[in-house]
UniProtKB/Swiss-Prot annotation:
Name by which UniProt lists this protein: Co-chaperonin GroES
Record's keyword terms, sorted: Chaperone, Cytoplasm
Assembly and interaction partners: Heptamer of 7 subunits arranged in a ring. Interacts with the chaperonin GroEL.
Taxonomic source organism: Corynebacterium efficiens (strain DSM 44549 / YS-314 / AJ 12310 / JCM 11189 / NBRC 100395)
Function: Together with the chaperonin GroEL, plays an essential role in assisting protein folding. The GroEL-GroES system forms a nano-cage that allows encapsulation of the non-native substrate proteins and provides a physical environment optimized to promote and accelerate protein folding. GroES binds to the apical surface of the GroEL ring, thereby capping the opening of the GroEL channel.
Claim: Cytoplasm is one of the keywords in the record: yes
Molecular function per GO: ATP binding; metal ion binding; protein folding chaperone; protein-folding chaperone binding; unfolded protein binding
UniProt gene name: groES
Residue ranges crossing the lipid bilayer per the database entry: none
GO terms under cellular component: cytoplasm
Amino acid sequence: MANVNIKPLEDKILVQINEAETTTASGLVIPDSAKEKPQEATVIAVGPGRFDEKGERIPLDIKEDDVVIFSRYGGTEIKFDGVEYLLLSARDILAIVEK
């Protein structure tokens, strides 16, 4: 896991995108023009959760080092210390990949 000095607020999640495969299972190279935008990422940092109507904090089900699948066009791309990250809202996370 990367040691990053970025602490997400509320229900925000900082992830590092897992690069898509560049070859198929049979060994064919996939050209850049045919690659889909990756939707799998590793969680780097998680905010404390948002507050409900009663003022109580709702913690997130996601934790650091989880591998998640996120909405294709969700989040904000950021670059920190030369590394690219994506800052997502909890609602942009579609699933946790269990390995």
